């Protein structure tokens, strides 16, 4: 049975344990988050005036990499076909001064730069920059600008430390300071590594003897971080729905072949 347990949730990240799965599923979830969860990003720019020191192409690339808020409640982001919807982000600026992402004017108030303080270009006295940028829904598999964030996972492991190891109390104290669960018996302590835990060098000689590491079968610790386009919990939810939809489509195609 698949189980999820949230370890830590912040406005821009979430850490959780998923149990009862294998490596292919864990990697499929990671790849789906990175390559299949759609977001808005600038896909085309029409320059009307550019007196800045940067070529049009450089500014267009910078605009494309600005994370744009994506209203998940308005679009079927878990659908296999994306909505054909375009948002216009306009700018008319004159130097001197720095042009920031927050200066962009959006035709849709729900689709705008997630961070208004991203610098785009610095204009000198008398320089002007005017353009219309067009943002569309896309997927990370087509371009990194559509990736909703970052995701990585590790095996859930347990470190068994025998009380015969000199200064084992030091490891217990270190693990507790890191916020790691520690179980203690008469013979040993067991540290569950829900996040990175590195042994001090003085204990390395005891690895494989008084200290051993155990991989918990079928359990993985995931960390997902959002760029700001989507709430981090929605990224995971949408990715799981996409996985289910693709699996259903695959099964249906198999049934057609069987018939």
From Swiss-Prot:
A GO biological-process term: DNA-templated transcription
SUPFAM superfamilies: Insert subdomain of RNA polymerase alpha subunit, RBP11-like subunits of RNA polymerase
GO cellular component, one term: DNA-directed RNA polymerase complex
UniProt keyword Ubl conjugation, yes or no: no
Any Pfam family: RNA_pol_A_bac
Keywords annotated in UniProt: Cytoplasm, DNA-directed RNA polymerase, Nucleotidyltransferase, Transcription, Transferase
Enzyme Commission numbers on file: 2.7.7.6
Reactions accelerated catalytically: RNA(n) + a ribonucleoside 5'-triphosphate = RNA(n+1) + diphosphate
Localization: Cytoplasm
GO molecular function, one term: DNA-directed RNA polymerase activity
Keyword Nucleotidyltransferase: yes
Function recorded in the entry: DNA-dependent RNA polymerase (RNAP) catalyzes the transcription of DNA into RNA using the four ribonucleoside triphosphates as substrates.
Quaternary structure and partners: Part of the RNA polymerase complex.
Family of this protein: Belongs to the archaeal Rpo3/eukaryotic RPB3 RNA polymerase subunit family.
Name of the protein described by the UniProt record: DNA-directed RNA polymerase subunit Rpo3
Organism per entry: Thermococcus kodakarensis (strain ATCC BAA-918 / JCM 12380 / KOD1) (Pyrococcus kodakaraensis (strain KOD1))
